[in-house]
């Protein structure tokens, strides 16, 4: 199933609200940001993002975690896994993350998002410095060895076509804001690396 290309109407104009992004952020005592977790299936994107959200919640910050599987149950349930649908999936999530950041939230997005162009598309939606690319850096060998959902086994058997890392390319980030050595450190250590970066960027205090 393929989504139709949206058509822009010149009669539709942006309505500026009185309560703006800065006001919402000040209420929450935090700086809006979109942390975009990217990496191969099984690298630990959702695990690290979830653990980070737990820590941020404990510290009193306002967050929302967007998970690749979860959004396909609703917002992107009409999309398949063709290249066109995968691009549309990321475009929709990028727009949603932008709205959530506008609400003053710290957004954690965990998606394979294999192509640099699609990640750049999301980056370009946001003000400079608000998009934080987090590369959950684990090798194909490590991810396939974990295979928590049995997807690599199915892909190797030809049951899942166009599976990222097997018969579909994953383009690793060239210069991510955060590079997490997910094959070497514990989840707790990776969370600390993220927290330190957020403090340096004054997203949190």
UniProtKB/Swiss-Prot annotation:
InterPro entries to which the protein is assigned, alphabetical: APS_kinase, P-loop_NTPase
Active-site residues (renumbered): 113 (phosphoserine intermediate)
CDD domains: APSK
Keywords: ATP-binding, Kinase, Nucleotide-binding, Phosphoprotein, Transferase
Coiled coil segments of this chain: none
Reactions performed catalytically: adenosine 5'-phosphosulfate + ATP = 3'-phosphoadenylyl sulfate + ADP + H(+)
Role: Catalyzes the synthesis of activated sulfate.
Name of the protein described by the UniProt record: Adenylyl-sulfate kinase
Annotated organism of origin: Vibrio parahaemolyticus serotype O3:K6 (strain RIMD 2210633)
Gene encoding the protein: cysC
